[in-house]
C-alpha cells in the first residue's frame, strides 16, 4: 500500500486487509500522522521518497516477503467477497500468477456506473512475488507481466473512494497534469491543441463512456478529465515558451 498524507483514509484501507499475513505501507514523508496510524493498526511502514509512482510501487513490493502480493491504494477498500476469492484462489494452484481486480468507485454520494469507472481497472493488483513489475512513468504507470502466463481477472470488486470532495478533484488534476508533462515532451503543442485534447477527454468520458448517466457526478468526472488533460498540455506549452517577466529598474526619488 502506498500513501502520502492520507490520515483520513489509511485506517479504513489497512483495516480492510487485516486478514493478510503482513501489511506493508510505503509512506512518502507524510506529515499528517498517516504513518503513525498505519503502524498502530499493525502495518509495517517503510519510508520511500517519491520519485514517481512506478518507482514507488516497485520499491514497495520489494519490501514484501509473502509468496503473493495484493496491492491496495489508500483510497481503496478490500471487500469480503474479494478477500474470500483471493484466499481460495491462492490456496488452489491458480492458472495465472497475475490478476486484475475490478473496482467500484464512489463519488458525490453515489456509486458511479458510467465514465468508464465501472468496472474500473488499474494495473494488476494481485500477483505472485516476482511475477510483475511496474514501468517507471511518473504517473499512470504501466506494468510488465514477468510470469509468462495469461493475466487473470477476479470476479468480485474492491471499493474505491477517489475523492472526498471537489477540492481533492482539483488538487489531483493539478498534480497529475504536472506529473504527466514529461510524457508529452516529444509532442508539438499549442494552447489550441491543449483545449482540443481537453475537450476530447470531456466528450469521451461524458458521452462515449456514458458519464451523463451519473448526473452531476458524471459531469464533474468528465470536467476533471478536461482540466487534467488541458493543463498537462498547457503546462508543456508554457515550458516551451519559457516566458520571463519584464525586468524593472530600481526606482529612486528624482532630484528636483
Report the location of each language-model feature:
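Conserved donor nucleotide-binding strand/loop of the catalytic core
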Residues: 35-63
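Catalytic-site signature of metal-activated, phosphate-bearing donor transferases
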Residues: 54-61, 68, 72, 79-243, ...
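A conserved acidic beta->alpha catalytic loop
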Residues: 16, 27-37, 73
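Short, structured coil segments at secondary-structure junctions
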Residues: 19, 40-42, 122, 147
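Acidic helix N-cap motif at the loop->helix transition within catalytic regions
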Residues: 8-11, 32-41, 81-82
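Short, well-ordered alpha-helix to beta-strand connector turns
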Residues: 20-21, 42, 64-66, 96
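Short, well-formed alpha-helical segments that are part of the catalytic scaffolds
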Residues: 1-22
